[in-house]
Each structure stands twice: as C-alpha cells, then as structure tokens.
Amino acid sequence: MLRTITARRFGPLWSSVTTSKRTMSSGGAAKEPLVLTEEVGSKGVITLNRPKALNAINLDMVRMIYGAMKSWETSKSLVIVKSVGEKAFCAGGDVRAITESGNVDLAKSFFSTEYGLNALIGNYRPTYIAFIDGITMGGGVGLSVHGKYRIATERTMFAMPETAIGLFPDVGGGYFLPRLEGKLGLYLGLTGFRLKGRDVFKAGVATHYVESKNLPALEQQLLATTSSTEVEKVLERFSEKRDAGVEFVLEKQRKQIDQCFGAPTVEEILKRLEKDGSEWAQSTLKLLHKMSPTSLVVTQKQLELGAKMDLKTCLRMEYRLAVHHAIDSDFKEGVRALLIDRDQKPRWQPASLAEVDPARVEKFFGPLPDGSELVFEDDPASPTNKANL
C-alpha cells in the first residue's frame, strides 16, 4: 500500500506553525518538523517528533495536530497518533515556557488551543487510536484518553502530576479521572501516582495492552482495515486480556483508596489516612504533604464537579482554572522548584491545608472577564474569544 508522507501547514490559520518541509539551519543540517502527518488511503497517522524533549507539546505542535485532524475529519475513517522514540509518547505540555515568559496572553493561547484539541479528540468522527508507548503525562494524557482507543505497552508510564507544580490535572482530567473505578481517579489526580505498563490497562486508562515490539504489525493491520468491526477484531487479536498477567499494582489498596479518598474534603482525606496507619497510608500522606495545598483543594473540587459534566463543559471550567493559575504564585513556584532550579523544595503559599482560604479557591472557579471564556470552534453563535486555533 502506498504511504504518502506529509507534514504540512493548514492554511493561513496555521501561519505561525513550524514549517512542514525540512528546512536548513545555519549549520546546514536539515531541521525535522515537530509533527509528522501521513496519509494511507482513508487512514491518517500523526507522529510527535520531538524525542529530545520527550515529545512534550508546545503551542505550534498543538496547532499542527489540530489542523491535521480537522482536515481529515470528513475524509478519513481512522487516525492513529504515535510518537518518535522509545522513552515517551508525550511527557506533557511545555509549562516551563509559559511560566518563564510571564506572559498571561501566551498562557491563555496555549491552554485554549490545547483544550480545543482535547474537545476535538473527544468528539472526533474518525476512529481515534493513540499508541501511548512510553511516558504519558499531562498534555500527553489529553492527547490520548479522550479518544476511542488507547494502546498501552510495557514501556507506558501514565501520571497526572500537576499538583506537584501548583497546577491541577487539566486537559479534561476533571472529566476522565472521576470516571475511573471507585476513587482511583481522585487518588491519581491528587497524588500524581505513576501507573506503568499493564497497570495502565488494568486501571482502565488504556483500552488495550500490546507489547511494543508488536506495534508496527498492529499499525499495519489497522491501516488495512475496512470497517470499525474489523478494527475491533484487530485490536482484540493483538491485546492481552485485562485480567491476564500479574495483579493490578493497587489491587490490595482498592478498599483503602475508596475509603480514604471518599472523604468530602482533602483535610478529611488526610485524617482518614492518618487513622488507617498502614505503610501505604503513611507513604500516601508523605506524598500529599509535598503537593501544593491549594492545588489539592482545587483538584478535589474540580473532579467532584467534573463527574457531572460533559467533556466540553469540563474543559470550559478547566480553562477558568488554568487562566487563574497562570497568575498564581504556586504555579510559578512549582515549575521553578521541579523543572527549572530542580531543588525539589517549593515554597507554597499558603504552606498548609489549614491556611487555604475557601473564598480564594472559589475564585479559581469563578467566571473570567467578558469575552475571555473558552468557546469552541463549533459552538453556536461563537463570540470573538473562540479557542485560539
């Protein structure tokens, strides 16, 4: 089958996007595009091509992915998203660039564009399949969990560690985390606990588990399918069964997670963990005490509200949170401590849960100024503050 490889801009709307063709740097070396697109008849393949940065996505990359997906929305039956390299599918969004710039408009542009892509994935007409082979965090989660199929491998490492940098599990985290079994999603969202390999599948984050060595053959067979039923059969043929292999890493803690994280407030969660007293509870307490107290409270409320929302409504809520966080001291401090200086010693303000002001938390969820709310491209009567796509 002829495979036509392209990596292109998508009209004037994408004029700021990295050029699709290979360009020559001043040293004469070819510069690879950060996103590659490939058309195989009625199928499409999108490849993240930033392996040295663990395929972390920046604004240009988000725009390129969105542009490719929109151009294929009515012409393709199936789209595969994967990445270059063995370490990472996508390690997240480039939050360091956002905080270092100090530019709130850049933050708004990035988050609105990224959330617009998340919404598109969640409502995409073609069958969407993400090969989450390697590190999958933050923005990489947003590129995968809202699609119909997510393929984990033995190299997959899933985490939503945003509370450690003074943020919250965004990219629709408020939608998909509370829909995991029991209180597992809240546990993952508050602690940033890392799931690896088969456990990503057993937790329900991935829909299938395939050994990485078999991904090329899986891709080839998927690109040769002619119906959604055939796609299902191919995936089932390659995938392990969910109950196969070793026990889920958190299986023995399921009841404790549901009991402790079923508390109505973060403070009560900590009290239940203290009362539990087990080795797991003690290590979880130690982990939570490292996180931004404000982020913990915001995240608990975010997931509580998101459990009752559709994806787009949840993303609108998260955009409010993101804009408010962009000017908040904890986000800047968390990025500094973990990603810039890397001293691992963030100075949170406030420093304890007891000091978190409920009124301040409510402001994070409050409306933005007129004309500043997130509006998606396909929303009726869209005003001028449409997602910056």
Regions found by a protein language model. Give the residues of each.
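Substrate-recognition/cap regions that form aromatic- and gly/pro-loop-enriched pockets
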Residues: L270-D276, W280-R320, A326, D330
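Hydrophobic/aromatic residues within transmembrane alpha-helices
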Residues: V81, D94, L143-S144, D199-V200, ...
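Glycine-rich beta-to-alpha active-site loop
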Residues: I121-I165, P169, Y187-G197, H208
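C-terminal amphipathic alpha-helical interaction region
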Residues: L321, S329, E333-L389
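Conserved CoA-thioester-binding segment of acyl-CoA-metabolizing enzymes
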Residues: L2-K82, A119, P380, L389
